[in-house]
Amino acid sequence: MPAYEFEMRHRGSGEKLGHINLRIGNMDKIVKYGGHLGYDVYPEHRGHHYAARSCQLLFPFAMSHGMSTLWVTCNPDNIASRRTCEIAGGTFIEIVDLPEDNDQYQEGERQKCRYRFEL
């Protein structure tokens, strides 16, 4: 699946804050379990909504690839990521159980929250 990865950088200082990636396409395992967007903000920069803003900045880019809906998933106990999805404009849809053959299940994860973003 085609994907892009970008650095999150502070607009004023240029300091690296984390990274974000966008997966292009609608494979079932991405839509249901993995999500189109993934992000990580370095611990010392958390709490400033950098991930939410970075997600929003990628929406036009996703649209330029013909995407009209994006999915983001996170662990149910990851309150910060759930809040990021809400701040970025996502709609909580459901919590799903991961199938046993899913890579994330093999890593010990069992469920994912699914958020939908209509572009």
Placement of each model-derived feature along the sequence:
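Short hydrophobic/aromatic beta-strand element in the GNAT-like acyltransferase core
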Residues: A3-E7, H19, G38, W71, ...
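Conserved acetyl-CoA-binding loop-helix of GNAT-fold acetyltransferases
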Residues: Y39-V41, G47-S64, R83-I87
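Conserved active-site alpha-helix within GNAT-family acetyltransferase domains
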Residues: D77-E94
